[in-house]
Amino acid sequence: MRPAAAPVVSVVTLLALGFAAAVAQAVLLREAMAAIGGSELAWGSVLAVWLAGIGAGAWLGARRGGASLAAFGPLAVMASTGAAVVLVRAAPVLTGAGAGQTATAWGGAWVWGFAVAAPALAGGWCFPAAAAGLAGPGGPALAYALESGGAMVGGLAFTFALAPGGAAAAVCVGAGVCAAALLASRGAGWLALAPLLAGLAVAGPAARGLAHAGWGWSGRLGELAAWRETHVQRLELAAGSPAAIYADGRLAASFPDPFGTVERAHLAMLLHPHPARVLVIGAADGAFVSMLRHPVERLVAVEEDPGLAVVLPRWLGPPAASAWTDPRFFLEAGDPLRLVGREKGLDLIVLDDGDPTTLRRNRTRTVEFFRACREALAPGGVVAVRVGVGDTYLAGAGGRLLAILAATLARVFPAVVAVPGDEVLLVAGREPGTVTVDPAVLLARWRAQGARDGDFDPRVVPLLVDPARAAPLQAFLHASRAPVNTARHPRAVLLAAALREARGAPPLLNAARALERLTPAVLGIAVALAAVLLLARGAVGAAFGMESGVIVGFASMGWWVLLLACWQETVGSVYGEVGALSAAFMAGTVAGAFGARRWLPAGAGTLAGVLGAGAAVSAAIAAGVPLAFPRAAIVPLLLLGGVLTGAAFPSVSLLAGGGAPRRGVGRGFAADEAGAAVAALLVGLVVLPSAGLAAGALGIAALEVAAAAALLLAASRRRR
């Protein structure tokens, strides 16, 4: 083998680095989301550490290391990502979580920070070191475009090829690609294919080994019988009976469950006198088996995850066999919003899909969805909403979550009745006076419907509705003054996620309550102070390279988080699509960087114009365009955001470097990633749940306008 020319090494290294970084980021985000039950709390925490690590690495790379050493950077990113995956899977053991419990975001933060930091530092250091091999005034733009191009390919490869195999398979194949690129850049010829083939060969065994090891580290009872990575979540099935199905590490269903699912299913069917047409959102617990004991004409169970719908008949086993051959029963895999809009004339809708602990789950707990449910109901129709909050203590975050969901339901329906229990059931009718939970009436309906189930004794009905407990619960809801939960302002998500995460972590619940009370006015004051600081820097004629880099990074990551939240809220899970959505953004950065290199002179004026255009993108998000037209708007907005980010980088690096290209690339990239890290932490965890989509996007727009004005002010000061 002979060494290749330095530019070739740099070009291949930057492409491979983008590929490795995209795969690593997608893998780590998926692992973090799965580790805490699919919660977007992972977005802010993991992305903040990832981006801060990249920024710190870029700062180091601006000073030390050459293109030859940087060629090993992409492989180092993938190798350290593999170690990070093992650490995250082992988090229950490392954090001392109870048997069968997942590590919480609070307790596992140090594990994630340690795991994510290594690949992030390696990736950040590699970028300026590799970019140093690209000489000429267009070097920074070319380096940014090459890295973004590799990231685009990596994101697409992850979503459409690597994600179904799981994290271990993605890491093995990704490492093989990076090793092949390293050998190819050194003229290895066909020998470069060897590590790629090796990665493909070990991907399957590595995935199986990691699945079984992770099951063992979780401390769950029994053996792992089956597992599956879907585009929505990670599914696991415990061996033996009853069937225990885990989704993202949490127990999703145990079937059969005569003292939970069976009682809840029969009670739901008694809420309507003649439930002929029934729609159930959420199928994992097999409640439909008990519901089919009633004289229904058509029962549709909706499972949002097509991967779970495929395995459900096999995983629930013989106790559910009768349902699959019942001509009245239909299992639909797909979007609950679309399916509710399609169904008409329903007598009963049961929302059995769990609390809004994520933006994806929040989709079926908003005013918008409840309106769709009301439109789908026949006259006299009833909707029942399961809430994972008990009625025994309502003073804390649980009571607040229940009050918000009840207020949201009451915004659409004339009256809401609460049924007490370990999990409160909220019931609403299409017309006033439709709903009754009188035990005598419910027992009369049981007899009239002629249902028979050896696992259910109708004499427990008075205990299930318990009028003595229902009265104070109803009084609590009437006295509550709670806001409603909407797609634009998902108030319920942070409370629900914190409740699930709060085992042994009261500070997390306190933080969630504090954030809920945080008004948009407080955030507006914070944005105004930041704008004043930017203008003050401009007034003294600062070079403004680092400051503008921070704002560009903050805006780009803010757009990414808000647009992914819109996708999660309207289209579905980003668990599998995160790579493709990231690829859309990276495709824009490639176009923006190449376009700026060819047509835009780097400098303060160009950067101010880019920031002004970015404010227009933020305004479109604030106006609700991605929520109103999700499939038509989200990907184009990601592309446009990427174009502006890529177009800004040459000017950022010029201003940050003061004439030294490598210093400018390193410092500009570090500033960009630092701003992105702050946005990941603030926009995802604070701004979106507390102030909503519009306020968050308008805040980003205000910062961009202030930065553009400060840039022009600083440039005019320096010309004097």
Name each model feature, range by range.
Residues 1-441, 445-456, 465-720:
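Alpha-helical transmembrane segments of multi-pass membrane proteins
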